[in-house]
A protein has these predicted regions:
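Catalytic phosphate/metal-binding cores of nucleic-acid and nucleotide-processing enzymes, i.e., regions
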Residues: 1-129
Length: 129
């Protein structure tokens, strides 16, 4: 895996998807993991078009559509450093894991895909640092 700038969320996200590409042989479901590009700065016209097309504020960054342990997929909100969740993101948190950095996200994904039968309710709802 190459070195990534880990001073912001985009670097952590690139590192996570690089890790996922490397681990796909062990966890084939990783090939279906994707980023939801809701964030970022956009002009008003583009933002209005995207909103009409279904873009919603607060939707988690990463989706892994693999059913496990009674869940229909894993949503991850990826944070870096001291960044915190927004008000809109908090509305989604009942259905989302918040991971501070790519390594905790990778750890959660492995736990979810390989050992979901061992997940406890606390692990399912915990914010990982």
């Amino acid at each position: 895996m190459r070195n990534f700038r880990l001073d912001d969320e985009s670097g952590h996200q690139e590192a996570l998807f690089s890790w996922a590409a490397y681990r796909t042989e062990i966890m084939p479901e990783l090939q279906y993991m994707y980023h939801v590009p809701n964030g970022g700065k956009r002009d008003k016209a583009t933002a209005a078009v995207l909103k009409r097309q279904g873009v919603k504020a607060g939707v988690p960054d990463i989706m892994l559509p693999a059913a496990r342990a009674g869940y229909h997929g894993l949503y991850i909100e990826l944070k870096a450093g001291e960044n915190t969740t927004t008000k809109k993101q908090k509305e989604w948190l009942e259905y989302t894991a918040v991971c501070y950095g790519w390594q905790p996200a990778a750890q959660l994904i492995e736990q979810y895909l390989l050992h979901s039968d061992e997940l406890t309710k606390e692990q399912e709802t915990v914010t990982m640092r």
